[in-house]
């Protein structure tokens, strides 16, 4: 099977993944998003690029991977969320928290699989601008993904909002 055929099967499976799947598949189709494979470090299952492409970690995924796998589909939804957020928001703990909560809520709704304790704590956090919550979120993400997942290098807020907070003490609204 070619990568293009596999990607089409992935989008078909995403469309069958409920209302959210249909929305995200439509987004990917409308933008003709390239979905490929790239070997990266073990703490990264997938990533997006500023060019609007999505890559799955070739260490974990290949053309042999089941496109209907709920873990794969929710991971794809996570990356699409980052494309929707844009470069600045996606590169913040705030953006990561939104994508992680979306991914794992959907995964556990669809599979009812037992949750890792760090994911359970992450899902219990209120999504918003509270800096203490965002710091906790980063800790839970690293507990789950490992220290090689460098969320600790990201600003808590999208960069412009982070700078405003640090200069003027103004929390985003």
Predicted region positions:
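Auxiliary, metal-adjacent structural segments of Zn-dependent hydrolase domains
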Residues: 1-55, 61
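Extracytoplasmic/secreted cell-surface and envelope-processing proteins
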Residues: 64-65, 84-85, 94
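Short, surface-exposed coil-to-beta transition loops
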Residues: 49, 68-71, 93-94
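Charge-rich, solvent-exposed alpha-helical interaction surfaces
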Residues: 9, 13-16, 79, 118, ...
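Post-HExxH zinc-binding segment in Zn-dependent metallohydrolases
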Residues: 92-128
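Pan-zinc metallopeptidase signature
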Residues: 134-173
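Active-site recognition of the HExxH zinc-binding catalytic motif
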Residues: 74-87
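Short pre-active-site segment immediately N-terminal to the catalytic Zn-binding motif
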Residues: 56-75
